[in-house]
Amino acid sequence: LFEIAGIENDIHSIIGDIRDLESLKKAFDVAQPEIVLHLAAQPIVRDSYKNPVYTYETNVMGTVNICECVRHSKTVKSFLNVTTDKVYLNKEWAWGYRENEELDGYDPYSNSKSCSELVTHSYINSFFNDLGISVSTARAGNVIGGGDFANDRIIPDCIRAAVKHEDIVVRNPFSTRPYQ
């Protein structure tokens, strides 16, 4: 999306694999960030069933790698881990969930993002509090960013349909989010 928006020359972007700790360390050394926004993920629920190992490597160990880089950074002051609204134990009740509800996730994607939050919480208590690094987590419904053209993602699917002047298909019109 950087190219489509015409901002690829205005934003410093490093493309890499979150599972590669050494590359992440180099990226942190180059960027020397003060604020880290962690949105990297294997975000496709259907793909998590096809390749759960890759999903956990990316979403859990990738978070460990980011946390390690934050922990060893001399410049980071604030860290945000963005997960998903799918982290909650689905109790099939009629009312919305609160942030302090029990974590779970029935499928590999949702569970891996719950694990990502647990990793972050462990790093807060084990390292970040003592280092004075402010840490937050956010549970997003839909996240979109540069290069996000994956199938089975509502926003990219709607954009593709609109560009082609096709009907926008709502796959499950009765679906609700756990906070609704």
Regions found by a protein language model. Give the residues of each.
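N-terminal Rossmann/SDR dinucleotide-binding element
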Residues: L1-I35
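A short C-terminal helix-loop "cap" of Rossmann-like NAD(P)-dependent dehydrogenase/epimerase domains
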Residues: I7-N9, N100-E102, F127-S134, I159-R171
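Conserved NAD(P)H cofactor-binding loop of Rossmann-fold oxidoreductase domains
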Residues: L39-P43, T83-D85
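Catalytic helix-loop patch of NAD(P)-dependent Rossmann-fold dehydrogenases
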Residues: K50-E68, H72, K77-S78, V87-V143, ...
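Catalytic cores of nucleotide-enabled group-transfer and carboxylate-activating enzymes in metabolic
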Residues: I11-I18, E22-L24, W93, N100, ...
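Conserved catalytic core of Hanks-type protein kinase domains
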Residues: V30, L39, A161-A162
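Conserved acidic residues
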Residues: E34, R46, K77
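Substrate-binding strand-loop-helix patch
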Residues: S13, R19, T58, G145-D152, ...
